[in-house]
From Swiss-Prot:
Protein task: Specifically methylates guanosine-37 in various tRNAs.
Stated name of the protein: tRNA (guanine-N(1)-)-methyltransferase
InterPro entries in the cross-refs: Alpha/beta_knot_MTases, tRNA_m1G_MeTrfase_C_sf, tRNA_m1G_MeTrfase_TrmD, tRNA_m1G_MTases_N, tRNA_MeTrfase_TRMD/TRM10
Family assignment from sequence similarity: Belongs to the RNA methyltransferase TrmD family.
Membrane-spanning parts: none
UniProt keyword list: Cytoplasm, Methyltransferase, S-adenosyl-L-methionine, Transferase, tRNA processing
Catalytic activity: guanosine(37) in tRNA + S-adenosyl-L-methionine = N(1)-methylguanosine(37) in tRNA + S-adenosyl-L-homocysteine + H(+)
Broad EC category: transferase
Assembly and binders: Homodimer.
Pfam families cross-referenced by the UniProt entry: tRNA_m1G_MT
Chief subcellular location: cytoplasm
Gene Ontology MF term list: tRNA (guanine(37)-N1)-methyltransferase activity
Species this chain originates from: Flavobacterium psychrophilum (strain ATCC 49511 / DSM 21280 / CIP 103535 / JIP02/86)
Gene Ontology, cellular component aspect: cytosol
Gene responsible for this protein: trmD
Length: 225
């Protein structure tokens, strides 16, 4: 997978890709990530990427021109499966979406700022709009990082144990149940006996039951899907 991120704050994005799972994926050659500073594509001396909204109102709006030039440049070099805009009014990211999107080859992620981008960007360039929740952040960079992490960990070969991703919360619309590790008895707080029984069929059944109960208590809406 190749991910091209368009941003006005590339320095905000770099460090998460230099550690942990995302770094491992890059080092293995399983994913390529590139940052494109939108200010490099402006045609004005000030390198500004925003202007006042037509009709007045609070805030600034990101210009069409630098976004057009950046996306057009990238598309001249390769084909992209999706051009994604991170925005609070997009479809809310979920596990089903990341499962399917992890199979894509090349994607562009546009990080918004200020009041957002000129609507013509959304009309003519964006193929998918994604939100990470019903709240507003200072920019789309943190949302882009969430999306990247959620996608990259699903790429085959990234996790040392590929079955780990398949048993995460939200797979099969269930939250993960309780998990335990050693010691089996700590200050009298004991691990459920079934988990140390060695009876794998019973363990699987216990985990399924716990996942269902946990989901019913915490996120009953998931069971309606």
């Amino acid at each position: 997978m190749r991910i091209d991120i368009i941003t006005i704050l590339p320095e905000l994005l770099r460090s998460p890709f230099e550690a942990s799972i995302m770094k491992r994926a890059i080092d293995k050659g399983l994913v390529e990530v590139y940052f494109h500073n939108l200010r490099d594509y402006t045609t004005n001396k000030q390198k500004s990427v925003d202007d006042y909204p037509f009709g007045g109102g609070a805030g600034m709006v990101m210009n069409v021109q630098p976004i057009d030039d950046c996306i057009t440049h990238l598309k001249s070099e390769r084909t992209y499966d999706e051009v994604i805009y991170m925005t609070p009014d997009g479809e809310t990211l979920n596990q089903k979406m990341t499962n399917s999107m992890s199979l894509l080859g090349n994607i562009i992620i546009l990080c918004g700022h200020y009041k957002g981008v000129d609507q013509r960007v959304r009309d003519h360039f964006i193929t998918r709009e994604i939100s990470i929740g019903d709240y507003v952040l200072s920019g789309g960079e943190l949302g882009a990082l969430v999306l990247c992490d959620a996608l990259i960990r699903l790429i085959p070969g990234v996790l040392s144990d590929e079955t780990s991703a398949l048993t995460d919360s939200f797979q099969d619309n269930l939250l993960s149940g309780p998990i335990y590790t050693r010691p089996a008895d700590y200050k009298g707080w004991k691990v459920p006996e079934v988990l140390t029984s060695g009876h794998f069929a019973k363990i699987d059944k216990w985990r399924e039951d716990m996942a269902y109960e946990h989901t019913k208590n915490r996120r009953p809406d998931l069971l309606d899907n």
